[in-house]
Amino acid sequence: MGQQLAVQIFTLDAILKSLASMNNISLEVVTYLMMQYDASIPDDYKSFIQGISDATGIPYYEVMFQVTWMDVYYGILVPAAIQAQMAQMAACTAIGSDKAIGQTYDLFSIMTPTLAYVKYTLLNRRPVTVFSIWQGAFTYPMGKNDRDVMIVGNLVQNYIPGDFGTPLSIKTMMALETAKNTEECLDIMLSSFTGGYNYIITDRRGNGVAVQTIQFIPTNYDIEEINTVEVRTNTYLRPDFAYFLLDPTYALERQAKAEELANAEYNDDGKLTTSELIDIMQYNDGTPATINRYPNPYNPLETATLGYISMNKHYIKFGLGLVSDDYGIIWM
């Protein structure tokens, strides 16, 4: 896998180091922080990190930098630098019913060459095939396995430090490689709170849930069963969670517009299809309600839509770049 993703891995390595330098973040500090997650990574996944290191020649802890970058940046550095008014980087929009879910993947447009969709099969005692989006060596919770467990998610920036539990990327791999249903997937995703994330998860039986998580105990997650449709963006819907947001106004207009569009489609015939999800995710009116964000060719550090996915228990529609009807499809 490391060899096939070599270009993306080397590119992300260069970008993360450059961003750290631009923000006056010491690589020594980053290395110290990411090493704190080491004890929470199962041995099989340490072997995975070592395998990428061997395949690419990038040192182990530099691969770890990629695997843990979102946990370190948003779980530790952003809360620690609250007075610095660090920019909102993520703008993902996740939408789902009990049968179909999808999302856009939005980050700095400079991240475009780091992305790839990856399909792989683990040939263990019970083989499992996984399809998900990767950013260098980092796996984001946006994919499906051949047991028809599906997950999408988005980052929520708040000012509470995360724990040093299992990193998001590793949890995502574990969930998609082992879960047979929504409950098993959810248990893994709630096993640590390294940052604030929302998830939508469903399975072949239509056991859909929409989840909000935040990094404090005892009320660090909120789970809603999906009865019609649910939308999750880069904000919290629970007032006690929203109190801790870095920017309480961020993503509210996009949240409202996505809810409006999803409910309109669902109310039309009592279901939400993968094609309707693609249509919703193409919405762009040039305001903060926009879901499909065009890149700014003059500013690669401006957020844009870099990829998207729409899936049900039969197939996955996906693409890199802006959401469009020109998507790939995998039956899985």
What positions do the PLM features span?
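C-terminus-biased signal that marks the final domain/tail of proteins
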Residues: 1-95, 176-332
